[in-house]
Amino acid sequence: MTKTELKPILVFDSGIGGLTVLREARVLMPERHFIYVADDAGFPYGGWEEGALKERVIALFGRLLAEHDPEICIIACNTAFTLVGADLRIVYPQMTFVGTVPAIKPAAERTRSGLVSVLATPGTVKRAYTRDLIQSFASQCHVRLVGSENLARMAEAYIRGEALTDDAVRAEIAPCFVEVDGKRTDIVVLACTHYPFVANVFRRLAPWPVDWLDPAEAIARRARSLVPLPNGFEPLNGEDPAIFTSGKPDFATRRLMQGFGLKVAAVGSLG
């Protein structure tokens, strides 16, 4: 199989947070082209009614798979994958889906205090999937679920170069910090792919040091394990396409995409 015959990897997110996963995946799969898809017409996912969001994502993937025929799809969105991942695998059994789920298992393995917080969207927090992960892997820990209504939007704005106020960020992360019987939270799981972009702000404003757990590298490693590596490949150069379901990303977003080696594709609205 020559490099021109290699199918691309599709990376999907509700917005631009999935760029954290794309960045890691490119390091591990330099022989592949990537297609980045941002469902900005539906962003943010956290406030959607579950049935409507499930219907939207399944229909959207029907169009994406038909048009792009990727090798695999990486769902770089906790809210989407915890809701619709199983359904995507049933509806499109010919496709491999690699999902993003809260990194509760590694957090439970690493914590010393036994106090772990999961910083997510409201949608991810209320999923049975998330609670099943806690029951399976962190039953001996005190796990606090923090569903932020605002942080994904704030992170998108920050990535685009807009300023955030310390007080606004501090209010969003404050519930993550718990003290019980002289012990303190020592790990916060970043259960939204937007949040790692703001992790340095979190570190600066945290009331005490914690380990902010970013799952992007683990997701990329999982994807790499499922993608065949051809013999004699050469790393690819050039821009990959970025697709926005609104069909109209603003100038700041286009500039950001360029910084990630992506070129916004000229497509009509998909959403």
From Swiss-Prot:
Alphabetical keyword list: Cell shape, Cell wall biogenesis/degradation, Isomerase, Peptidoglycan synthesis
Pfam families listed in its UniProt record: Asp_Glu_race
Reaction equation(s) it catalyzes: L-glutamate = D-glutamate
Superkingdom of origin: Bacteria
InterPro entries: Asp/Glu/hydantoin_racemase, Asp/Glu_race, Asp/Glu_racemase_AS_2, Glu_race
Biological processes annotated in GO: cell wall organization; peptidoglycan biosynthetic process; regulation of cell shape
Positions annotated to bind substrate: 13-14, 45-46, 78-79, 193-194
EC numbers, comma separated: 5.1.1.3
Listed GO MF terms: glutamate racemase activity
Enzyme class: isomerase
Signal peptide: none
Active site per UniProt: 77 (proton donor/acceptor), 192 (proton donor/acceptor)
Annotated metabolic or biological route of this protein: Cell wall biogenesis; peptidoglycan biosynthesis
Family classification: Belongs to the aspartate/glutamate racemases family.
NCBIfam families, per the entry: glut_race
Free-text function comment from the UniProt entry: Provides the (R)-glutamate required for cell wall biosynthesis.
Protein name from the UniProt record: Glutamate racemase
Higher taxonomy: Bacteria, Pseudomonadati, Pseudomonadota, Alphaproteobacteria, Hyphomicrobiales
